[in-house]
Amino acid sequence: QEGVGTEGFKEVYSRFHNCVAAFTSHYRLWQKSVEENETLMVLEHDAYFLDPISGVPFSDILSFGRPSYGNFVTPNTIGKNKLISKQYLPGAHAYAVTPSGAGKLIAQAKVCAKPTDVFICNANFDNIEEYYPWPIEVRDSFTTIQKERGCLSKHNYNENYRIL
């Protein structure tokens, strides 16, 4: 699609076609942000609001999501901070993007696209921020993207979790 390669999606944690489809939905929203010159909030189906969010100024990408898998660092400053909880989005379930940030995401996708959360990382983008305390968390009981190996580090993974 539009010069975006798929090699980065061939990995052990996710099902290839499902992962590409999820990335494509984010990519289309980035395009919409650029085309309409609008800042967008990107939410996945399992995003659950714990607190309201009001106008927080930011430059490119601002994560609102509590880390949903693996180990992470808790920011020690309340409010907007440089992304430190992980070196990549701690799950792509809740973030906002400006038209400038969306343009950077689109350009980088043509260089090295991969699963959305690890694609949006400090190594690729120098201006990712996160808001703490995290006002949104994942409430998931199933996945259509990950393989079992990709689910093992999810905080909500248990014997009732379903891989569809």
Language-model regions, residue ranges each:
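An acidic/histidine-cluster motif and surrounding catalytic segment
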Residues: 1-43, 47-164
